[in-house]
């Protein structure tokens, strides 16, 4: 039976078609599949922040101080995007655009840290080094690339490194961040529909600078309020403690570090509950993101791995809850167990993702509560103030 609004829908879609816009703009009702096409932040701990429900076609901001893991996190997202796209038929695969405004993206570190091959021939990276180009030109390049329908992920590194044409030739004293804010405001207003139509995700990496005016939060970011409000997801990264080969956290002065923890705060989300605010992932300097260790942390959170007696752990069957391992002495020895039983790890990993995606469990306790961590104190942020600024 035809909808009473069907005639109106066809008429409105025809008007857009006459303007050269392909595809239906108007629909009757909203498809339940609208947000089923999601992508990963690359770590079970980080995906848990968002209930593993990040939709494609949105604006994301990753902000943080120097060396806090912003670009490395973007590399990991790109790596997982490639894996997902390669599962599609060749004619449906989309590619990556990487805008290296800083000119510092290292393909070797991208591959070591995250598995992101910037020279992959199956899912290619359109790499732009716009050194000397104005912000207007760079953002126009991005929109032009997205309009082809061939780009599924844009990584922009970073917003703080671009300058509008108006101030590009000015002296350093005259440059300010206001021009970038106006440009980003125009960019998101004009192109939100474009990114949504082609399901292209835009990741804007942003640095922090400090205001000395004495009012409010001294931390400032480029892009302005409109950019913040256009973002459906905002993450703040922080370099956490180093750890040794046994996973023991170290002080900065301690020897024997093989990696460090990247701590991530969820500043804003538009698509899931905002009750999980802290994620922690392990970055091994020679092996990259340690997904095994992150799986252990989240599986412990969900009770799949249980501390049964004073530092002795057991791994339980993800479905039945029955023990499937002997007592393992020390949490550091769970990882070798998984390395020897990768089939068990994969079952635990899959179950972890199933459990983290449930949005209706009132008994869930966030990582920060379980670990007794004050996220506002750790990151120096005020979530109430962030909510007001994010819109």
Regions found by a protein language model. Give the residues of each.
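Generic beta-sheet signal
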Residues: 60, 152-156, 200-202
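N-terminal cationic and glycine-rich segments that engage phosphates or anionic surfaces
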Residues: 167, 210-214, 310-312
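Conserved inter-motif catalytic segment of the P-loop NTP-binding fold
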Residues: 81-177, 181-186, 190
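Conserved, well-folded catalytic cores of nucleic-acid-processing
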Residues: 11, 15-18, 49-53, 65, ...
């Amino acid at each position: 039976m035809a909808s009473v609004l069907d005639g109106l829908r066809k008429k409105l879609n025809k008007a857009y078609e006459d303007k050269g816009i392909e595809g239906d703009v108007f629909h009757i009702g909203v498809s339940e599949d609208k947000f089923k096409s999601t992508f990963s932040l690359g770590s079970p701990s980080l995906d848990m922040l968002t209930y593993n429900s990040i939709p494609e076609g949105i604006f994301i901001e990753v902000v943080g101080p120097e060396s806090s893991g912003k670009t490395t996190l973007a590399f990991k997202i790109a790596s997982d995007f490639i894996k997902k796209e390669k599962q599609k038929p060749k004619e449906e695969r989309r590619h990556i655009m990487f805008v290296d405004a800083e000119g510092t993206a290292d393909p070797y570190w991208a591959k070591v840290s995250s598995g992101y091959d910037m020279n992959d021939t199956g899912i290619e990276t359109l790499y732009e080094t716009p050194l000397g180009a104005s912000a207007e030109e760079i953002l126009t390049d991005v929109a032009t690339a997205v309009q082809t329908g061939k780009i599924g992920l844009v990584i922009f590194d970073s917003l703080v490194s671009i300058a509008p044409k108006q101030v590009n030739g000015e002296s350093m004293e005259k440059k300010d961040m206001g021009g970038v804010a106006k440009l980003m405001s125009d960019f998101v207003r004009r192109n939100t529909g474009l990114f949504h139509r082609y399901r292209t995700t835009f990741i804007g990496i942003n640095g922090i600078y400090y205001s000395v005016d004495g009012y409010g939060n001294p931390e400032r970011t480029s892009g302005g309020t409109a950019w913040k409000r256009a973002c459906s997801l905002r993450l703040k990264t922080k370099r956490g403690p180093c750890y040794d080969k046994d996973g023991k956290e170290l002080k900065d002065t301690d020897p024997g570090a093989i990696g460090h923890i990247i701590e991530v705060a969820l500043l804003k989300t538009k698509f899931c509950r905002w009750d999980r605010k802290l994620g922690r992932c392990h970055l091994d300097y020679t092996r990259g993101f340690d997904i095994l260790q992150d799986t252990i942390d989240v599986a412990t959170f969900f009770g799949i791995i249980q501390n049964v007696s004073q530092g002795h752990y057991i791994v339980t069957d993800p479905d039945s809850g029955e023990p499937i391992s002997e007592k393992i002495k020390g949490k550091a020895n769970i990882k070798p167990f998984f390395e020897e039983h990768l089939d068990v790890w994969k079952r635990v990993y899959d179950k972890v993702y199933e459990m983290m995606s449930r949005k209706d469990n009132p008994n869930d306790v966030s990582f920060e509560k379980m670990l007794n961590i004050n996220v506002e104190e750790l990151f120096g942020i005020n979530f109430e103030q962030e909510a007001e600024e994010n819109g």
